[in-house]
Amino acid sequence: YNNLGNTFTQLKKFEEAEVNYNKAIELKPDHAEIYNNLGVALDNALKIDKSIDYFKKAIQINPKYINAFYNLGNAYLYLEKYDEAIKKYSQILELNPNHTRAQQNIIDILNFHTVDNKNTNSIIVANNNLKKIKSNFTFNHSSKITDLSNFFENSNKIIQRHNKDLTTINTQIYRLNSIDLGCDRHFRVFNKFKLIPKFCFSCFKIQIEPTSVLELFKLFFIFDELKLPKNNIRKCFVELRPDIPGTYKGLIYCSSTGEANEIIKIITPIINKLTDSRIKIKRGCSEFSKLFPEFEEINKDKINFMKYKNEWEEKEKIIDATKIKNFKVRDTLGGLSISDVLIMNNWLNYAKEINDLTYKNIDKKIFKSTFISEKLSNQLDIRKKNFLDLIKKTKINL
């Protein structure tokens, strides 16, 4: 019955799964795995409160059942009970200090949720200490590179003091608002049907291309301090998508070209003061333009300006008919977080791999990221070329 329940769960037939798990429980009422599996089925069916009872029962039977702790933490996370979620992830780390998913979930929560200073989890202690560091680097005056270097060095020391082996596979630093753009949903539509969702036709981005990792760090601080009328979503990242050219990028999300142009007026003096980055407006995601080149056109008065095809709407409805567990988006807390520092270390590894020597201006003793090395292994030559091309275009002698 347990195996049959697992099969129905994989087929997304959650009611049938629940029936079979309950039959299994009747036969083996002290079997922790069955309770956990039933909780997973209920969780996927969005019966979150009910799933929590079964995860707790599984833990009651087996107090060292890590999967049940993890699933319970995720259920609390979905319900926005962040302190409860962190408590469960922390209990996992007491059982297995190297459980990377529990570590990452705590790190992610700390991007938008403040935890009591009394919490003794080493990740939280490090994050709270990072919040106390004051940076001399700001876009309001002429800052020195040494200010940036000292700031990062002090931040890294805090993490190493509390979590020597802590890493992340994330490479993008976001400054989010509470508006969910639905990007995961839109890519499900695109990947399944090879069409561009209607929402994305009104999505425009200001793309900023820093010329080095040093410039990317500067852009991060600009984005962190930037005050915009609508607190637009923004992010800094290194390019790792195999078919998308470029190296270092920053994006500000806008709902129209008009809004993008207004924001460009605000940010251009700041960007030009601290960096040599190129600024442009682009439409939607780069993956869309690979399949539909005309989607790149941002001038609606041009003949080749692409418009949404109404027949695509029925395909979108197919995706929307599928119940998906969507976590609520919340405003990112200002200031440096442990997530930011770990991602910055990945940026420095990326820079070292592509021969961008400006990483030495920030920190010569970077911590090796096997994740970055593996991600770049099949695209290292093209990234090195992208970097050299960027230098030539901006006429910068690094």
What are these regions (language model features)?
Residues 2-10, 21, 33-44, 67-77, ...:
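Conserved alpha-helical positions within TPR/SEL1-like repeat arrays
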Residues 78-80, 96-218, 235-237, 298-398:
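Charge-rich, low-complexity segments
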Residues 212-213, 254-261:
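Helix N-cap motif at beta-to-alpha junctions
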Residues 219-223, 263-272:
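Short amphipathic alpha-helices in soluble, non-transmembrane regions
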